[in-house]
Structure formats: C-alpha cells, structure tokens
Amino acid sequence: MATSKSQQFQLIEGMELQITVTGLPNGSSVRAEFHLKNCTRAWILHWGCIYQGNNHWYIPSEHSSKQGALQTTFVKSGDAYVVILELRDPRVRAIEFVLKDGSHNRWLRQHNGNFRVEIPWNDLHAHHRIPKTLIERRAHKIWDRKGRPQSSAREQQIDYDNAVRELHAELARGISLDELQANSTVPVEKEETSEPHHTMIQSYRRKHDVQKWLQKYTEPINRSGSVKSSALAELSKRSVGQENLVSQKSFHVRNYEITVLQRDVKGDCRLWIATNMAGPTVLHWGVAKSSAGEWLIPPPDVLPEKSKFVHGACQTQFTDMSSREHSYQFIDINLKRGGFVGIQFVIWSGGYWVNNNGANFVVNLKSADSTSGKLDVDEKYVLKWLLDEISEREKEAERSLMHRFNIATELTERCKDEGEGGCIGIMVWMRFMATRHLTWNKNYNVKPREISEALERFTNLMEKIYLQQPNKREIVRLTMALVGRGGQGDVGQRIRDEILVIQRNNHCKSGMMEEWHQKLHNNSSADDVIICEALLNYVRSDFRIDAYWQTLQTNGLTKERLASYDRPIVSEPRFRSDSKEGLIRDLTMYLKTLKAVHSGADLESAIDTFLSPSKGHHVFAVNGLSPKLQDLLNLVKRLVREENTEPLIEKLVDARIQLHPALRAPRTRAKDLLFLDIALESCFKTTIEKRLISLNFNNPPEIIYVICVVLENLCLSIVNNEEIIFCTKDWYRVSEAYRPHDVQWALQTKAVLDRLQLVLADRCQHYFTIIQPTAKYLGQLLRVDKHGIDVFTEEVIRAGPGAVLSTLVNRFDPSLRKIANLGCWQVISSADAYGFVVCVNELIVVQNKFYSKPTVIIASKVTGEEEIPAGVVAVLTPSMIDVLSHVSIRARNSKICFATCFDQNVLSNLKSKEGRAISIHTKSTGLVISDGNNSDVSVRHIFISSVPRGVISKGKKFCGHYVISSKEFTDERVGSKSYNIKFLRERVPSWIKIPTSAALPFGTFENILSDDSNKDVARRISVLKDSLNRGDLTKLKSIQEAILQMSAPMALRNELITKLRSERMPYLGDESGWNRSWVAIKKVWASKWNERAYVSCKKNKLDHDAVCMAVLIQEVICGDYAFVIHTNNPVSGDSSEIYTEIVKGLGETLVGAYPGRAMSFITKKTNLKSPTVISYPSKRIGLYSKPSIIFRSDSNNEDLEGNAGAGLYDSVIMDEAEEVVVDYSREPLIMDKSFRVRLFSAIAEAGNVIESIYGCPQDIEGVVKGGHIYIVQARPQV
C-alpha cells in the first residue's frame, strides 16, 4: 500500500495551497500534487529537493537545470491551479519551494523562508528481513576488499556487522531485496592455472554510485532584491562608457557584488567602484605605489567628494545611482597620473565590515598601454599583466627556489580573483620550472628550511584557492602535482642535518658525497630526490656504477646538469663495501625526508603524512572518513612494494573513492587530502600503463574491467565531470549486458566508446584553448626553446588521467568492430571515384575552393554543416557523421564518395599518399582503395559527368501580405517546405500530427528592405554585394550583419500577432517576444548570405540573386525524440527498406553540426513491425526548448531537381534551446526492447504512409511527443 501525507498553507489574498505527497511502498517513486485554490492567475513553483543529511537544494536526477532549481508553472484544472511532480530519486527526503508570481515579479515565502513538505517514506527495514546468506556474501565482499587478510573471530564479526549496516543502507535508498540478491554472487575460488588473465573473468561486474561524484560548478542563484550580479558590471559600463576601459574586475561576497572599472581618461587613471549594497555605504581604502601588498594613504589631490582621512586610510561615501529598473551605488576616483600599482579596500555597510573572505579587496592597476602587450596573443585566455611581471621577475626568481616560491605566492595572491587565466599562468610557470627549462639556483646560498617554508606558503595558498574557487580545482591539482609539500619547523632543516649523519655513520665525508652535501646546504631541490634514488640503486646493485647513471638519466639528470649547480657534483660515488647495509638504511630514511619536502605526488610520503595526526586534528575523525580508507591505504603500500599491478589498480581507485567525499568539502587539512589524492592518481597512472603491456584486447571481460576502473578514476579527477559520469554509468550497463560474440552488445559498446572518444577529444581541445596561449606567450618571454613550447599542452594532457583511457579505447575498438561485423569504413555516400589526394585539418576551411582536377579530400574534421568544394570526388574522414546530416545528403545528390574511417593506420597510410592519385571502389564491405592508374577512365568520366549542369532559380513576387496562414499557402507564395505541410495536413491519417503553421511569403524581405526606414541598410547591402560579385567572400558576413540592422514596419508586427494567435500558437506578442521573433526572422533572411549557401549556388551554377526566402513559422514541438526518415535506404539504395535516425530532444542535433551519432534503424516495408537497429547513439547533447516558435528557411531553390539544398539555410528558434548532456544509461530506447519496437514501428509506418501519399521516396523530419508522431517537414528524397 502507498503511504501519503497532506499539508495545507494559507497564503495571501485568500489563496490556499494544499499538498498531497504519496510514496509507493517499493520506495522507488514519489508523487506530489500541489493544488492552488482561490487564485486568479497561474503562479510558478520554484522548487528543489532535499537529500538526507543535507540542507542544500538539489535537482532530482531525472531533470537538469542550470540555475540550481526547477520552475514548474501551475496549470488550470477545474476551480484550482495544479502542479503534479513525480520523483524517482530515492535519496529525496523533502521538497522545498517558494511561489513566484511571474506577472508581477514577486516571490511568496513562508515566514521569510522556504515552504517545505516531507516525503513519507516507509520503514523499509521493517518490511524486509535480510537473509543470512545475503549478509554472509556481503561480509565476504568486505573481506575481499580488504585484500583477504588472515582475520580473527572478532574481525570476522566486525565484517559481518558492517555487512548488515551496508545492506540496510542500500534498502533505505530504494534498492530492492531482489536486486541485492542478484548482485551478491561470490566468485568461486579456483585453483591457479597457467592461463593468463583468468582471474579477470568475474571481476568485470564492478559498479559504484558514480552519480554521487558529480561536480558541476556554476554561478550561485542571486537571491537579493537588488541588481543581479550579471547586470551590475553592464550597468556600470553603460554609465561610464566602454571606449576608454582598461580593465574590469568583480568581487562576489554573500549576496553582494562589487565591480571595479579602470579607465584611461586623457592619460588619467580613473576608477569606478560600484556595488549593489543598499543603505549608507563607505569605502575604506588605501593605495599601493611599489607593490600590490602596500597600503598607503592616498594623496589629498586624488580624493573624491565626500571623503576624509581616518587612521592611516581614506574613507569615501558611496553615491546612489537609480534607473527605472535598478539601483546601485558608486564612487568615481581620479588617481590622475600618480603611478599607483593598485588599491586595497574594505566596505562598511549595514553596521558591519564587508571584506574579501577575511582579506582586503585588492585591485591591480594597469598602465593604459599595457593591454597592447609585448607579443601578439589572444587576451581571452591570457592574463598578460601577470605573465609580463613573471618575465620581469624571472631574474630574481632564478636565484633560488625560495625566491621563486615567494614570488609565486605573491603573484598568485594578486591574480587569484582574475579568472582561470591567473591560475593557468602560475601553473605554466611552475611547469617550465619543473621540466628544467628555467634555472633553479644562481649565485645564492639558501637553507633547505627556507625553501621548505617558502614552498609551504605557496601550497597553503593553493589550498585556499582549491577550497574557495571550486571551478579552478583542476588547475590547482596540476600545479600542486609539480611542486613539493614544503613545511615549517624542522621539516626542511632535517635535509641539512641528516646528510651529515649519513656521512658520519658511513665514512663518506669526501668525494661525491661531500659535493652533494654542499649542494644540499646551498640549494636543495627535487633533483636531490633523484640523486638519492640513484645512490640507493647503486648500493643495492653491489656498487655497480651503471645503475647510478641509469637512474639519473631515466629521470632527466645528466652529467652536465650535475656539473651546472652552484655547488657542482662532478665525482662518481665511492663507498666502502662493508657500509652497504648502513647506507641502504640511512639513504632510505633520508629519501623520505627529501620527498616530504620536494615530492608532493610521492605516494608513500603522502600516505604517511595523511595518517599522522596534525595539530591535534586526526584527519579521519574531523572529515568523517571511513576506517576502511586506512585499511586500503595500508594495503596499497604493501601492493606497491610487491609490484602486484592487478589488485593495486582496483585498490588505488577504491582508496580515492573513500577519500572523495572529504575532498569535495574538507573540514580541515585539505592540503593533506589533496596531496594524497594526487599521489594515488599518479600511482594509478603509472600502474595502469604497466598493465597495458600484458592486456589481451581480444578478451572483452578483461578490457571491460580495466576501462571500468579507468573511467572511475577519471570521474574522480576532473571538475565538471557530468558527461564522464554518464559515460561511466553507460559502461556499467554494457558491462552487465556482456554476452560473448553478441553483435547488438558490440554495437552498444561501440557507441559508448565513440562517445568517450568525442569527450576526450573535446577535453584535449579545451586544454589547448585555455593553456597553450599562455604557454606560448610566457615561453617566448622566458626564451624557452620552441619545442618545449610547442609540446607544452600535449605533455600536460599525456600526463593526465584521460591519456590511458584514450589508449584503451583505441586498442579495443578493432576488436569490437570485429564482433559487430563492422569494417574499418562506414560508407555514407556510395560512389566510385578517382582523384588526387589532398589532406586538410577541417573541411570547412576549403569549402569555397575550386579544384581544377579530380580531388580526394582527407579531412581530419567534418562537422556535417559544410559544403563539399567543387572538383572534389571523395571526402574521407575519421569524424562520425550522421547518414542523414545535411552534408551527407548533398554528397549523395552530387554522387560524391563520402565515408568515415575507423582505422587510424588506414587513414595514416592514405595521408602518406598526398599529391598522388588513388582509385576508390565501393563494395558491400566498405571501400577498396588502390593507387591510381591509366585504367581508371570510367571513374574519371564519373567526375566529369557529375558536375551539376545548373538549375535556374525563378524569382518570386510579394503577395501584399507580410504573414499568411497555412490555408493561404501556394507554390507562388511559399517554398516547397511550407507547401508540403499544407499538402500533408489535408491527407495524413489523424494519428499522424502536423504542427500549426504560418509563413512570411516570398518577397517580404525585399519589400521591407525597400522601405524608407531601411534605405541606409539597403544602400550598404548594395555596395557590399558589388564587392561580393567581384569575388570578395569576406563581405558575406558584413551583409548578414547589415540585415540584422533592418527595422520592421508596424504592419508586420500586427499581422504576425494576429495570424499566430489565430493558429493558436504559443506566442504572446509582448515587446520581448516580438523583439526575439524579429531577430529570428532576420537571421533566417541573412542566412541566404552564409558562406556555405553562397558557395553551393556558385558551384551548382545557380543565380544567387534570384534566390527568394520565405519563412515557415511553426510551433516548436517540445518532444521526447526527433527523427529523420528516408523511405529509400540511402546507404544501400534498397527501395524496400526505410532508413531512420533518431535523437533525444530537438532534431537540430541530428541535422546540424553536433558531434556524435544518432541511433539508426532500418525497417522492411513488408514487415514494419520488425525494425533492426544498426547503430546506437553517441550524441553528447540533447536540445530542449520551452513552448516556443521556430522560424524555418523556405527558399525557392532548396528542392530543385538535381540540386539538394538541404541545410544550406538556417532555421532559428525564437527562444534559445537549452543544451542538456544526455544520459543513456537508463534510456528506454536502449533498455526497453518492447518500447523500442513499438516506437520504431510507428515511425516507420508514418514514413510509409507519407511515401504512399506522394508516390515517391521521401525525406521526412518528425518529432515524438508523449507517444504521438508529429511530422514537421517532408520533401522528395534526392
């Protein structure tokens, strides 16, 4: 029986809110009904979920929202307004909400707080008696996780009790007893055999609740009644103008924002400081002359009005500034030409001081000409003032590591609030140092203790940034992995003291050991860790000198490097033979001392530091960590010593999983937590790389397991890890579904790997975008060699957690293709070809070129939006392109060979043939490619005869109305896209839905452009077209920009509102809605001049000036899925098969340039009830829209005979669609076969019906919403 709970709230104006919440007995879902009575208009429910043990709002897992909460509009039902929520997240313990009156922009709360309703969960413990066998199996798993130690009776009882607690907790989370039984099998112990990898067979059933590891960091919701945070800076810039703006900086503290704009006004430095604080507010400030850390009293001649001097500072009152929508306060300070380098301030408001999280607000000032910089660089990703100052201070930094870390601390403090660019700049500088591109010591003697203390100050600041700015955590991790931990007190001093003890105990006070002793006293560094390891290997090998040099050289230390120290090491080690044991003991202990300071990523050192109490705080007790972590860490240390890679891989990740909750929100000793996690990750990477050598990629269970663990490790390593988490959940799904030699399993697994490849490629590109510009700029300033600069980001990526996953995916892919009966080619457009090979990075770069001889393009990247250049007979690419994308359709229409290659070796071989001729023949198994020769005459003929002959577009006249209804559509007023909608509406059966439509007919654009209000725009377009006709394609963008400046006649607005309301479309016609729709209309018109469309017209010998653009207006169907049907299989040419591709959300991800593949299936027309899936989805993004209007291009040349115009022009949604990362792990299309067959059969039947109406093959676009089929477009299939 379901349990329920009701609550009532008496609201303002006599309104009453009644809530009934029902929880089902299986604990899997909750239904909440909100009934708002006695109200006259629809309110909005602004809500979020509360999880057990947490007071923050969370978004239930089946939804997505960028704002951190969800908004649901009440719907009229009888005499009340109703919202019904269904939640399937068993973690939800309460729903909190407020009510929003959208029409009056006001909020309704309960006593200045949130309304709250508890979820009536059943007492699951009382309903389930856990079988003893299940408890024993779980206890066995707990014992196995600990490494199967010899356990006493008491330890066995502890495992049993822990098993009971775990099972009760899982039942409380909504997991059924049957599921627990199914997942509780204990692997049967078998005798060891000589067969490799045998122990991996049972291990692949690994699964964690990775959703708990989600990290998404976005701007917090603004809850103040003042100016929104995103608006204050814009208001300030509107107030002072942007023409003289030098820099901009914003601070966010609680609900307050402070914006500081620096301007250059006739050579004077002017500061505009604005805040959204209310009431009397005072700026308490000082200036800096020589360094940002100074606080000096400003000179009297720079004081603004309402200022006074107080106790070593100046205080200035803010002035109110109000507008119709917003109000804020400001101060305008003219620092003139005083040569100040910065200012510091705090603010007094509301009876207390406002500061920057315990520190002063600091603003570094820039000279007006500093923005020009010393080198050409894109400032979007580079904090130039920081890099310039690093360059200027490098001479000081190279004196010693103490100097370098002290300067790094100072600069990091100054730049930490200036976006990611600041932290990236520091990381790049530290990496140039760590890779020995910079000098570590020059003519300066510094104690190890001083280096250690300087390093600790730097890492303490990194810890602070990690805690306060979660979006920078990846960069902070990269930085801390490059440096040591540092330490106060005797930590650094022990380096100096213990070397003397080693020399005395082992009688080695001269030679190499004395040279090293002098080097350690003068300037200890990370090199000393390597030297100590080399000495240990030398001693352990019975004093073989080659072991010493091999260790040094493996780690990048050469004889020249040793000799270059201020205190050079030029001698080789020489020890007494009877000192071996003492040296091993003493050097081993000394290595720990060195690593404690210089090697933050050393695992043993990190574990020892982590487990030791610090300042009375035990890290486990304070951070709420499980004792299981301590067992895992001790086990890891043992496995590392044993070099047992198979169990070590799993235990390293298990340790990170146990550490992760504390690492996300540490209460104390965050630096120790972070260094431990970095060390675990580093050890994992090293171990898995060793494991790669012996992996059998033809044994799927083994590879499934390894990829599983690597994915979990990656989830734990990156910020904004939502998509990797979804891929990991999907990988769990295919792991559990594994069946040997199962084709459908291989296709599903291939789709997951395809998506992973896209995610990893995108992540690499992101790193190149944000890191490489800084590396290039700073590297040139510091005179780093060109190779070191060029490979900088590549080396960062290869050292990261994604590199090994990329290797695994690439090596497993051929095995999967073999199981799935896939070759190395997917043929998208089948045609034989002969041509000369040309290699390009991106097809779009050459889309407007004309090749005078038949050309085969090998393009590293194709998006699906491009036009194939004239003269090209084939396009080969590794990019995964949908068969029904626009570029695919145009390739088939032009009889151009178009194919995706999955084998990098094949592709590399083809690229090596650049400049030479090749022949391509299409077979049922893929492509057969050979070197070109004189026998390819027939293929050459194909090239010559396939050049389009040219179809003349016929101009269209304006009908006298700006907007017409679908009943008024004729082929003289609208294009085939609109006319076909009218044709279909009159003929399709009732179960096929057609969305409501209207149109702006042909000639509307030309008529409005000729209006007097647009004469300047018309004149500008005419001039630009003259240049365009002379071959200047750069004018295309200028024409589009000019069209966006057009003004609309009032009659257009009135007609649009009238027609759309008569068609019952969701169009309010208010000022905001009109403005958005007018912009969308102009964007559709402007798309006539996009480069792709213009080049296509010229290539096909069409008169571009004769192209007319109608605009089809349709209601956006906010569906579950979107699909495209070709009723004649375009891949095989089989007219008895219907080919369909389907995606989640809106169809733009299918036909547009969105990476990944759609799900595809074929259906025999003679057996519509038996669709066959031929590929599973790897699309990363789903597009979702609220009820809105779409404006579709409908030109007079898109569907002419012999010309495929699909996708040449743009369609624009009035309200921007939201991009949502897709989670396929529970997708019914994949998981529920009966649902899939029903839906696919209905789609195929709709395609068959429409083909029969037209009597020829059709290209159909449609939407699935609530099980209903909507057709939004149909055209003849080319």
Curated annotation (Swiss-Prot):
Catalytic site: H886
EC numbers: 2.7.9.4
Catalytic activity from the UniProt record: [(1->4)-alpha-D-glucosyl](n) + n ATP + n H2O = [(1->4)-6-phospho-alpha-D-glucosyl](n) + n AMP + n phosphate + 2n H(+)
GO molecular function: alpha-glucan, water dikinase activity; ATP binding; metal ion binding
Enzyme class at the top of the EC tree: transferase
Keyword Magnesium part of the UniProt annotation: yes
Keywords: ATP-binding, Carbohydrate metabolism, Kinase, Magnesium, Metal-binding, Nucleotide-binding, Signal, Transferase
An annotated GO cellular component: chloroplast envelope
Signal peptide: 1-23
Subunit structure: Homodimer.
More details: The reaction takes place in three steps, mediated by a phosphocarrier histidine residue located on the surface of the central domain. The two first partial reactions are catalyzed at an active site located on the C-terminal domain, and the third partial reaction is catalyzed at an active site located on the N-terminal domain. For catalytic turnover, the central domain swivels from the concave surface of the C-terminal domain to that of the B-terminal domain.
Domain notes: The N-terminal domain contains the alpha-glucan binding site, the central domain the pyrophosphate/phosphate carrier histidine, and the C-terminal domain the ATP binding site.
Protein name as it appears in the record: Alpha-glucan water dikinase 2
GN (gene name): GWD2
